[in-house]
């Protein structure tokens, strides 16, 4: 387990993100929607996406504190399809405030892909074990059955009715001891794509 996460000061709300996976999905959405809508799609607004995930996870307006943990491969210095994007210089240790409260960002590099697969579920285990955490939003690589099943197993062992846990994926997945939300909606909002614009082109 990465020492950086072991020493983390947890917040009442936590968003745990496989950042490499979300970046890849965002690239696919940009390519597909540029073709469909016939216009350039700008990089996704990271703060807007985080807000949308928080809302989908049940957070409402107020003076909340939310920790956003971006897990990424060590050889990836930045998100390619979001702004701001540089893990070390623009994201790690930074924060922003809006109507949903304060969001604290922690970017955690992982050495190898195999380590990353298990690291994500280990990070999730650590998060669900924290008594002070009331709300957890999880964005794993749900397209990988191994990773998704590890996430499900971890969450199905959580014996805390006070925790509201939401897992985000691009399509509905086998359920468990958690709520589910579709990841694509928050990413579309962050990319400035509305359902009305899609309807007008179909």
Question: What do the predicted segments below correspond to?
Answer:
Residues 2-108:
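Domain-level signal for Mg2+-assisted phosphodiester chemistry and nucleotide/NA-binding surfaces
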Residues 97-202:
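Nuclease catalytic cores that cleave nucleic-acid phosphodiester bonds
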């Amino acid at each position: 387990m990465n020492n950086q996460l072991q020493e983390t000061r947890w917040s009442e709300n936590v968003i745990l993100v496989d950042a490499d996976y979300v970046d890849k999905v965002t690239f696919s959405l940009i390519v597909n929607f540029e073709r469909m809508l016939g216009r350039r799609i700008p990089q996704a607004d990271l703060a807007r996406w985080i807000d949308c995930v928080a809302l989908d996870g049940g957070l409402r307006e107020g003076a909340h504190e939310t920790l956003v943990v971006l897990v990424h491969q060590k050889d990836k210095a930045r998100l390619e399809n979001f702004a701001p994007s540089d893990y070390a210089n623009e994201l790690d240790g930074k924060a922003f405030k809006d109507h949903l409260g304060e969001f604290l960002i922690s970017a955690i590099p992982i050495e190898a892909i195999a380590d990353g697969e298990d690291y994500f579920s280990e990070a999730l285990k650590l998060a669900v074990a924290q008594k002070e955490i009331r709300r957890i939003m999880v964005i794993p690589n749900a397209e990988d059955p191994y990773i998704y099943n590890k996430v499900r197993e971890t969450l199905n062992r959580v014996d805390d009715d006070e925790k509201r846990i939401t897992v985000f994926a691009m399509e509905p997945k086998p359920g468990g001891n958690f709520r589910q939300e579709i990841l694509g909606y928050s990413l579309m909002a962050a990319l400035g794509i509305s359902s009305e614009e899609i309807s007008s082109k179909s």
